[in-house]
Structures are given as C-alpha cells and as structure tokens.
A protein has these predicted regions:
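N-terminal targeting leaders for non-cytosolic proteins
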Residues: 2-113, 122
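Short catalytic/ligand-binding loop motif for oxyanion handling, primarily in non-cytosolic enzymes
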Residues: 16-18, 135-140, 216-218
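Short, structured protein-protein interaction patches enriched in aromatics and acidic/basic residues
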Residues: 30-37, 155-165
Length: 235
C-alpha cells in the first residue's frame, strides 16, 4: 500500500531573523584561521525526509550553504544580503515557510557534504512533485544586474540556469529531473512558484540539487516548498 507525505516546512522553528540553519548544531574546530564553529549534516527532518546544510563562522560572520528554512519574502532588495528571501509573497500555496538552497561547489569539493543541497530519506521513496521558485537574490541579479557590493552593473545576458535534481538509490545515480530557473531561449527568469513533476526519479533514498549554468558568476540559489513523496506502508 502506498502512502504520500509532503514536506511543508511549516513546523520548523525559526530564529529572530526568520531562518533555520545549522548554527545551533555547530561545534568548535581548529583550522589555519584559528578556532571557529562548523557543521555539515542534517539540520531539519520532516517525516522520512532529512535536509542537509553547511554552516561556518570561520570568517567572522555566519555562512550557510546547502539548505536553509526561511520565511523571508523581501522582493525588493538586491544583493547577497537578501539571500534567504524567495521572490514571492510567501511559500508555495500561500504558506509561510519554505527552504532556500545554495549550491556551494567549493565547500562541496572540500568534503563538506552539506554544501550540496541534499534531501536524504530514511527509506526508499518515489518523489511525486515539488514547488520551485527563484530567490530574490537570484531574480534581481538576472533582471537588475545589481552587484553584491551595491554597485549597479548591466543585467547579464540570459543563459540557461538549470536546477538539476538527481535521484540516488543505494549510492547509485538513477535519474535526473531538470528545471530551468532561467530560460535562455524564452528570455525568461522564473518569477513565481512552479510545480515540477519528480516521478521520473523513480524509487530513491536521496535527492541532490545541483545548480548548472555557464555563467560562473550566477547566484547558485533557488527555493523549494511542498516536496511530496510516495512510500510503501511499512516498507
């Protein structure tokens, strides 16, 4: 018998900035820059799904990658300072909370698994669908051309920015579902929550979210909500 479950993020406890990161799970480590706090792993669990993140304050201020749960909906402010906002008035289907993903290829290459936005499952599931939108940071970067430091540059030429959702089972890549956050051919930047079919992934125990774009300066950010999966009862 198949049952479905949906991750809505509505039960997440957020801090005063309206986000949930791996900060409270971080432990002291000692590196070349001295002692700092760091965490890479699961920071939020809902049903069978566990979401991964990377957190560090090595450079004096909090740094996050992978997933962050958020309720930030500032659609006006460009730049990295607004990295936790979705370009929408709320989560999918008028909800309050959602997750922001940041694909940090550098820290992932350094063995920080949480730097790749990843969902692991406690048993095999068949993903059905997920809602996806751009973050405000990414949307403004593509449409306004605002630089990180507040300097205005011309909006970049629109090229495909693809969110590659890769399903794994027992460590083996099975299938991939691709969604265009920016569509070069249509000249469009996604500006609303969009329902994406994940059934081609089949039965998996992990989904990795990779950001793929030929413009290496493009913000590797995206937002997700309402991930629905099917699983077998007592599987």
């Amino acid at each position: 018998q198949l049952v479905t479950e949906t991750v809505t993020f509505e039960d997440a406890t957020l801090n005063t900035s309206g986000i949930l990161t791996g900060e409270k799970l971080a432990e002291e480590v000692t590196g070349d820059t001295g002692t700092y706090k760091e965490y890479s792993g699961t920071f939020y669990t809902s049903g069978t799904a566990s979401f991964q993140c990377y957190y560090s304050d090595q450079w004096g201020s909090p740094y996050t990658a992978g997933f962050t749960v958020s309720n930030n909906t500032n659609m006006e402010t460009p730049g990295l300072g607004d990295q936790y906002s979705v370009y929408a008035k709320g989560g999918a289907k008028d909800s309050k909370k959602f997750a922001v993903g940041y694909y940090d290829s550098y820290n992932a290459s350094q063995g920080k698994a949480g730097a790749v936005p990843t969902v692991t499952f406690s048993k095999k599931v068949n993903p059905l669908n997920i809602w996806i939108s751009n973050s405000t940071y990414a949307f403004c970067w593509w449409t306004l051309g605002e630089g990180d430091m507040g300097g205005t540059i011309a909006p970049p030429e629109k090229v495909d920015a693809i969110l590659s959702m890769r399903g794994y089972a027992d460590g083996t890549l099975k299938k991939e579902v691709a969604f265009k956050l920016v569509d070069e051919e249509k000249g469009l930047v996604v500006d609303e929550w969009t329902n994406v079919d994940l059934t081609p992934l089949g039965w998996v125990d992990k989904i990795e979210f990779h950001f793929v774009c030929e413009n290496v300066n493009a913000p590797a950010y995206f937002c997700i909500d309402d991930l629905t999966v099917a699983t077998e009862l007592n599987y």
